[in-house]
Regions:
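An alpha-helical, amphipathic repeat domain used for nucleic-acid recognition
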Residues: 1-165
Length: 165
């Protein structure tokens, strides 16, 4: 435990621990939830400092957990946007996204495969798939590579069946 003194208001200590025991959250989100309970700004500031010093409130951990949770559905752009909306500092966002960068293509392929079972047969379907993936926060480069990989996998699966004709 840290040397930071516990806030004098016992109610805010109890409320803080209850909130943070449920799930991780950013400083901004934590302060907003405490403010909704009508605590004074001074008590909220003291609680934030105390929780950070004792390791209850950790924005880097929050960013990692949130990115992992959202990573199955969304790309780096959307994850970064969500983290910034929650008040996570840019440094923590960049650090988290750089750790996830290697798996971006695999995640895009999984999302593409879950939503669209078949490769696009015309330009309209291709544009629809690209738009869908862009709204999910994947970059055009990653989308293009994921679609090429899916098309190559589909062609490889289809070749033996076509040869039997």
């Amino acid at each position: 435990l840290s040397q930071t003194p516990k806030p004098a208001n016992r109610e805010i200590v109890s409320a803080s621990l209850r909130l943070l025991a449920m799930r991780d959250m950013s400083r901004m989100e934590f302060a907003r939830k405490l403010a909704a309970k009508a605590f004074t700004p001074e008590d909220i500031a003291a609680a934030v400092v105390w929780c950070e010093a004792d390791g209850w409130l950790n924005e880097t951990r929050y960013a990692e957990v949130t990115a992992r949770r959202l990573g199955h559905k969304y790309g780096a752009t959307r994850i970064a946007q969500t983290l910034k909306q929650k008040g996570v500092p840019n440094g923590a966002v960049a650090e988290t996204l750089s750790a996830m960068k290697d798996g971006e293509l695999a995640r895009a392929q999984a999302v593409l495969e879950r939503k669209f079972r078949d490769a696009p047969s015309n330009a309209e379907q291709r544009a629809k798939q690209i738009r869908y993936m862009q709204t999910r926060g994947f970059s055009f480069d990653v989308i293009k590579r994921a679609m090429c990989a899916a098309a190559a996998a589909g062609a490889a699966l289809a070749e033996p069946f076509e040869a039997d004709d």
